[in-house]
């Protein structure tokens, strides 16, 4: 769980770094172009930038429809659909991070209870409360707690950061 969590964190970190750079380049080229149609025609077919993909989808819809009726409504609908599609791709994996962040401490707590129960069981079997009898169960309990926190803390921090980054990027797209 923790390994996959770190894989998602690294992938999202790289993704946000990439799309922020691409969107800055897109905006600069867009505002320096003579017209939206000229800019659309200059875009490569294999665009990776979500902002460019939203623009491309809206322009394709605009250019394919010759009718000028309800143009504003159609453009709004196409842009909203494009933004939603790109944000769904960007936010993939967020639910996993949130789930790990919220459940890992409970799994660690379960391990803690299990370790404490083992300590009590050792005391009952040996009828002795020396450190040598109690320590293995306590160590097991602390280890389980640490593992739960080790999985949860990075997942929660990453989820919050990426959720904030996602909201900011969504506002840029809109």
Regions found by a protein language model. Name each.
Residues 1-12:
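Hydrophobic alpha-helical transmembrane segments
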């Amino acid at each position: 769980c923790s390994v996959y969590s770190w894989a998602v964190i690294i992938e999202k970190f790289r993704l946000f770094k990439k799309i922020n750079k691409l969107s800055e380049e897109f905006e600069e080229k867009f505002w320096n172009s003579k017209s939206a149609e000229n800019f659309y025609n200059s875009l490569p077919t294999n665009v990776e930038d979500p902002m460019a993909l939203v623009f491309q989808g809206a322009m394709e819809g605009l250019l394919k429809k010759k009718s000028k009726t309800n143009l504003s409504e159609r453009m709004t609908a196409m842009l909203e659909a494009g933004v939603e599609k790109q944000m769904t791709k960007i936010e993939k994996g967020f639910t996993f991070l949130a789930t790990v962040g919220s459940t890992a401490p409970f799994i660690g707590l379960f391990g803690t209870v299990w370790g404490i129960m083992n300590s009590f069981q050792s005391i009952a079997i040996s009828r002795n409360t020396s450190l040598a009898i109690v320590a293995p169960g306590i160590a097991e309990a602390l280890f389980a707690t640490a593992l739960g926190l080790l999985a949860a803390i990075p997942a929660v921090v990453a989820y919050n950061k990426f959720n904030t980054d996602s909201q900011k990027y969504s506002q840029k797209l809109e």
